[in-house]
UniProtKB/Swiss-Prot annotation:
Organism per entry: Helicobacter pylori (strain HPAG1)
Keyword Cytoplasm carried by entry: yes
Cited InterPro entries: Ribosomal_L11_MeTrfase_PrmA, Ribosomal_PrmA_MeTrfase, SAM-dependent_MTases_sf
Role summary: Methylates ribosomal protein L11.
Documented EC number(s): 2.1.1.-
SUPFAM superfamilies on file: S-adenosyl-L-methionine-dependent methyltransferases (SSF53335)
Enzyme class: transferase
Protein name: Ribosomal protein L11 methyltransferase
Amino acid sequence: MLKPMYYEFFFIFPKERELFESFLLDTTHLALEESSLENLKAFDDKETIEFISQSSWHYFATHDPLKEHLKEKPQHLKNFVILRSQKDLNNSLILALEAFCLNLKQNLQSEFDFFYLSRNLASKDWLEAYKQAILPVQCAKFYIHPSWHQKPSHISTDDCIMIDPALAFGSGHHESTSMCLELLSDLDLKRKNALDVGCGSGILSIALKKQGVSALVACDTDSLAVEETLKNFSLNQIPLLAQDKVIYGSTQKIEGRFDIIVANLVADVVKSLYSEFVRLCNHTLILSGILETHLNSVLQIYYNGFEILEQRQRNEWVALKLLKKQPIN
């Protein structure tokens, strides 16, 4: 009997990677995995390392590519995005990305390239290999682990978050998520009310509940994210109380004010939500998912309403802990 197949896509986006990642999520509704050759080596995935390193990468550019700049293999293999699907998206997805590049060129008046590889493998083999590759990670006080890894006996259940990365939008391995968890670990949130904007897998909402918040609202504009959040609350045996809500939609549906707001988004969305965060935030705002190249434009917008308490950076990703400025009477 033939094993079912799945399709694996590797992408490198030299410019505006977060815009392309958002486009992939919106277009395919599939979770993305960001990785690097270093991470794959840690997973001992020799077959994938060999495939990525030795294959001739295809590319698309919105300008006539210069041979000295666009080689068969891109030189910047530090980061790439992996997408896996049970359907062959090769033709439709590449055409959609090409159209997106052209649209970005027109709107942003800049040139855009992307590199890609694809392959297909047996589903059963991949699922087992993937489970072996995903390891638990410690993010400050929080121990993040998939359901097929048992927590160590010396770690308290209160500090453990169970997330299955194959199904999730955020698993603690990405810099932006881990920095959010680190910033949350330092806060006393007992009897506080909290808002998680762009909840994704629900990992930050679960962390907020474990930190003792008395009321939680989580929202996301992706219905799949709402389903994942609810699923992961159940996986972690955290009941949603009467005052807790998981909402499909953005902040416009939310009333009241919150002691703490967390938003692990992309820079453009963070900038667009400034007035909403001014309306909703009563004290602390944690922002993440901001690439270093967009940091100054974010700070320029948030300067009038918030004070910077802490800034963290890991690789090219930045997270901010902000304090709401109170009006002077």
